[in-house]
Amino acid sequence: MSAVAAGSGARLDESVVAAADAVQEAMRRDLLQLAGQQAAVVGAAPAGAGKSHFVASTVGLLRASGLRVALAAPTNDQVQSLVQRVKELNPDLPVAFVHGQGRDLPGHLASLTGVTQPSAADAQRQQDPLVIATIDKLADAFLRNGLGDFDVLVIDEAYQADAARYYTAAGVAPTHLLVGDTGQLDPFSPLDDATYWRGGPEDPLQTAVGVLLRNHPGTPVHQIPVTWRLDPRAVPVARCFYPGHSFSAAVLPEARELRLMRPGPGSQVLAPIDAALDEAAASGWAHLTLPGAPVLRADPATAVFIRELAHRL
């Protein structure tokens, strides 16, 4: 079975796009007004809201305003993607990527003009660069050495960051911008004793945003009301994972199309998979239930089924 997607130049719902732009401008306005104060701004987004684009453009605006900015995310892959996105939108902006000592700058970043890999101390002495690092590296490299003279700390994927990491890095700047997908799974730990703290007022596995809002309930929270990734047929399902957050698809109904073409007859095993794919192509989503059975935490049968579904698609 092969797939053909139509509608790459999809028509947009201009009212939805305008509403999202207005929310993002309000976030930037709040952030600039609060810069330098002990304050924060939160941006809550559904999947596919363009939050990384918003973050990259916003740090460019902050630097253009003369503010020293530290940009962080939980994982190495995320911060490397942020470096690329920042350079795409701000090609002339110097970027200091603070990585592990003795590790070379990844090839796809080394080829970017204006991206350096200084030590934390060197990055601190430089006046121009935007500093980008993981939350852990930012806390270790700067606060351990008494550094961290930034005006604004920006954290992308903030709902994936746990409170413990946020506590360690929060001191690098007085003003924070936390942006993330509220539908993500909460932070977790593989340690058996991690549940000792669960439910406590200072649970280290709370989200960074959760602990911020509990301690500072007056923090402005802006909900980005758009998803560029989903079309209108899938949005009602996605909204179930975002209670209290209203958002709509940026593309108009029927602006996208998925046509599936079968190479030949399927089998009894493939029949439910084909039916689910046909339903998803027609309706924008599908729900497929496996036969009930007692399973372990790791369910190999489900993993095999997902693999077969992806292979068939």
Tell where the protein language model's regions lie, with residue ranges.
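Hydrophobic positions on the alpha1 helix immediately C-terminal to the Walker A/P-loop
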Residues: 54, 58
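Short, compositionally biased "basic patch" segments
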Residues: 1-40, 264-289
